[in-house]
From Swiss-Prot:
Function, as annotated: Catalyzes the isomerization between 2-isopropylmalate and 3-isopropylmalate, via the formation of 2-isopropylmaleate.
Source organism (scientific name): Phycomyces blakesleeanus (strain ATCC 8743b / DSM 1359 / FGSC 10004 / NBRC 33097 / NRRL 1555)
Binding site for [4Fe-4S] cluster: C341, C401, C404
InterPro entries assigned to the protein according to its UniProt record, in alphabetical order: 3-IsopropMal_deHydase_lsu, 3-IsopropMal_deHydase_ssu, 3-IsopropMal_deHydtase_ssu/lsu, Acnase/IPM_dHydase_lsu_aba_1/3, Acoase/IPM_deHydtase_lsu_aba, Aconitase/3IPM_dehydase_swvl, Aconitase_4Fe-4S_BS, Aconitase_4Fe-4S_dom
UniProt keyword terms in alphabetical order: 4Fe-4S, Amino-acid biosynthesis, Branched-chain amino acid biosynthesis, Iron, Iron-sulfur, Leucine biosynthesis, Lyase, Metal-binding
GO BP annotations listed: L-leucine biosynthetic process
Name of the protein in its database record: 3-isopropylmalate dehydratase
Length: 744
């Protein structure tokens, strides 16, 4: 039977790699601690701090405690450091040159490999699919599940193919390809799918350009994005610290070459795009699907016939502060941000530097460049890119997520407009009231110079899209300024936080069988909500993510809609502030694609804490849908007609009953069955309040059997310290000795 790339990885693997950061992990480690469980595979787990940390200079850095001023951010970072020590995990802290954004450090270390399954409590884990890996974001409950069992309960997605044929024109980059695709399919176009990107335009791209495309696949609604590995992939990985070596390398490459879709493989959805149709592209609204070529005008909602789409456009334009039919090149900006897990790698910085060299940013613009890792920063400085940027008036920063989302000091002020290389332009994403326009690094650089959204093709140094792998080792061999000091630091390195311990998988304590309240029936007045693409930033803004607990977030639910930003007073018109709906346990949303955006489990936690345990909509984003079940909540998908019927009764304040046992929704004068919408296992767990980690741990013998098969078949997937394999933290070479690779 012919299989796709996704089919092959799905059939062969469980969970091979787990990346951990400070925002979505505290509650997971607390769950392990409370259940007396250990991390099953420390050798397959890598942790770092990235979301909360400042990107200011670290020349005087001593510790997280003294460096991070904001209390909640500091607590999350300190908690991660405590947890990695207690659970014996590899950790790249702020004093480590290898620290950076999780989706940058994984590939540059060779932790990400073709054919692996990669997970992280971050929706942009899809980045790693550029290597032919199946990589997807997970919620905190699933983070805990992977830590405890190195497995996940998953339903297979559909296969979707996006084929881009032809040659990209000058000035068009992989970011433009990604935005163009999202504009075509919409933010829900890839829902329940894994997208395989292929075609001559994709095959010509460098690994870093491919990562940008796969990174954005989540914004098209997909569970993951994948690109088949090839010689460009192998050359990128060769010699990376955690890539296989010698005979194992040869065996790995032989396997990796088989990771491509068979000629007659079937796809559920097939999209074909001509590369010549793609122009430098930006967003104009508050959703990644709100895109247009830079040469276009702001769209006019009056030209749209669909009422829901028209309303969404009007809302977006009101927030973003644009007038229909205005040329996009006449839109003035206040800030420019080059960074994020989408566009902070060395090729991105080279592309932007080629535009700004010898020029200066507009007088009214603040512009910043934030490298994706300490190693990228060092490489850029060796190439003199930092000087190019600072001479042009840019701020040169340390590695971190920075202004991609306003969880750290790098934020927009209300009303400020930013040309950004990040991945989301949701309301308030970069700061409360901030206005975000997504674009490529070259486009952001051009906007910073001119002070307006700008067609990069008008600049003399128009960069071509990268088409070849970067020079060998360029981002993994940082120069050692002080060899003696470095050797001393390596000798004194904490063996717990710098390398995983030798030994077999460890689990302590009996499995805990029940951790959730049972869900059988809910009855009451449902709250109606008529908004499309309700995203996770709308459900719970980023400033409320700085918690190490699962509780106390009910007051933050729909914060921007419920409260006046100036006074903090309730907005009486918002549905959950109205007396009839203050105690609603059911929410009925008439718009599609509910819960799109981040993998943050804080969204269902906020609903649960408010008291809402059932959400009814026409469609849900995949990660939010899964996260609901992990928290004893029931998301129900119905037709538009059925949802509209329930919304009508909700508006009339009539009671609705959701009966999960019999899988029916009852309302005055009728009922709606939802038999086919809930899988039997999920129903069983909800009705009985079962903890699926405990259920999985009952399959320990099956997990051990798979691990033995993996060690035999794909030995390079075991960590360097697994079951007594030799491991040593090595120093980086000096001028008098050949440089050694960074190791764990």
């Amino acid at each position: 039977m012919s299989r796709t790339l996704y089919d092959k990885v799905w059939d062969d693997h469980v969970i091979d790699r787990h990346l951990v950061h400070e925002v979505t992990s505290p509650q997971a480690f607390e769950g392990l601690r409370n259940a007396s469980r250990r991390v099953r595979r420390p050798d397959c787990t890598l942790a770092t701090v990235d979301h909360n940390i400042p990107t200011t200079t670290r020349k005087k850095f001593k510790s997280i405690t003294t460096f991070i001023d904001e209390a909640d951010s500091r607590t999350q970072c300190e908690t991660l450091e405590t947890n990695v020590k207690e659970f014996e995990l590899t950790y790249f802290g702020m004093e480590d040159s290898r620290q950076g954004i999780v989706h940058v450090i994984g590939p540059e270390q060779g932790f990400t490999l073709p054919g692996t399954t990669v997970v992280c409590g971050d929706s942009h884990t899809s980045t790693h699919g550029a290597f032919g890996a199946l990589a997807f974001g997970i919620g905190t409950s699933e983070v805990e599940h992977v830590l405890a069992t190195q497995t996940l309960l998953q339903k297979k997605s559909k296969n979707m193919r996006v084929c881009v044929e032809g040659e990209l024109t000058p000035g068009v980059t992989s970011k433009d390809v990604a935005l163009h695709v999202i504009g075509l399919i919409g933010t829900a176009g890839g829902t329940r799918c894994v997208i395989e990107f292929c075609g001559s335009a994709i095959a010509s791209l460098s690994m870093e350009a491919r990562m940008s495309i796969c990174n954005m696949s989540i914004e098209g609604g997909a569970r993951a994005g994948m690109i088949a590995p090839d010689e460009i992939t192998f050359e990128y990985l060769r010699g990376r610290p955690l890539a296989p070596e010698g005979a194992e390398w040869d065996k790995a490459v032989q396997y990796w070459k088989s990771l491509k879709s068979d000629p007659n493989a079937k796809y559920d959805i097939d999209v074909k795009i001509a590369a010549s149709d793609i122009a430098p592209t930006i967003t104009w609204g508050t959703s990644p699907q709100d895109v247009a070529p830079i040469t276009a005008n702001v769209p006019d909602p009056s030209s749209v016939s669909d009422p829901a789409r028209k309303a969404a456009m009007e809302r977006a334009l009101e927030y973003i502060g644009l007038v229909p039919n205005t040329p996009l090149e006449e839109v003035k900006i206040d800030k420019a941000f080059i960074g994020s897990c989408t566009n902070s790698r060395i090729e991105d910085l080279r592309s932007a530097a080629s535009i700004v060299k010898g020029k200066h940013i507009a007088d009214w613009v603040y512009a910043m460049v934030v490298p994706g890792s300490g190693l990228v920063k060092r490489q850029a400085e060796r190439e003199g890119l930092d000087k190019v940027f600072t001479d042009a008036g840019f701020d040169w920063r340390e590695a971190g997520c920075s202004m991609c989302l306003g969880m750290n000091p790098d934020q927009l002020s209300p009303g400020e407009r930013c040309a950004s290389t990040s991945n989301r332009n949701f309301e308030g994403r970069q700061g409360a009231g901030g206005r975000t326009h997504l674009m490529s690094p070259a486009m952001a650089a051009a906007a910073a110079i001119r002070g307006y959204l700008t067609d990069v093709r008008k600049f003399s140094s128009t960069p071509m899209v990268p088409r070849s792998p970067p020079p060998k080792f360029q981002t993994i061999q940082p120069k050692v300024e002080d060899e003696a000091a470095h050797k001393q630091a390596a000798d004194q390195a904490d063996p717990v936080t710098d390398c995983p311990p030798a030994g077999s998988p460890v689990n302590k304590g009996a499995p805990v069988a029940s951790a959730m309240p049972a869900f059988t029936t809910l009855k009451g007045v449902a709250a109606p909500l008529a908004i499309s693409n309700v995203d996770t930033d709308m459900i719970i803004p980023k400033q409320f993510l700085k918690t190490i607990k699962r509780t106390g977030l009910g007051s933050a639910l729909f914060y921007g809609l419920r409260y006046d930003p100036a006074t903090g007073a309730e907005k009486p018109d918002f549905v959950l502030n109205q007396p009839a709906y203050r105690s609603s346990k059911i929410l009925v949303c008439t718009g599609p694609n509910f819960g799109c955006g981040s993998s943050r489990e804080h969204a269902p936690w906020a609903f649960n804490d408010f008291g809402i345990r059932c959400i009814i909509a026409t469609s849900f984003a995949d990660i939010f849908f899964n996260n609901c079940f992990k928290n004893g909540m029931l998301p129900i998908i119905l037709s538009q007609e059925q949802v509209d019927t329930l919304a009508k009764y909700a508006t009339q304040k009539a009671e609705i009953e959701v009966d999960l046992v019999h899988q029916k929704i009852r309302y005055p004068g009728g009922e709606i069955p939802f038999d086919x919408m809930i899988e039997e296992f999920r129903k069983h767990c909800l009705v009985n309040g079962l903890d699926d980690i405990g259920l999985t741990m009952q399959k320990d013998s099956a997990i051990e059997k798979f691990e033995a098969k993996r060690t035999s078949t794909w030995p390079w997937l075991d960590g360097k310290a697994y079951k007594g394999k030799a491991t040593k933290v090595t120093a980086i070479g000096s001028a008098s000795q050949p440089a050694k690779k960074l190791d764990w």
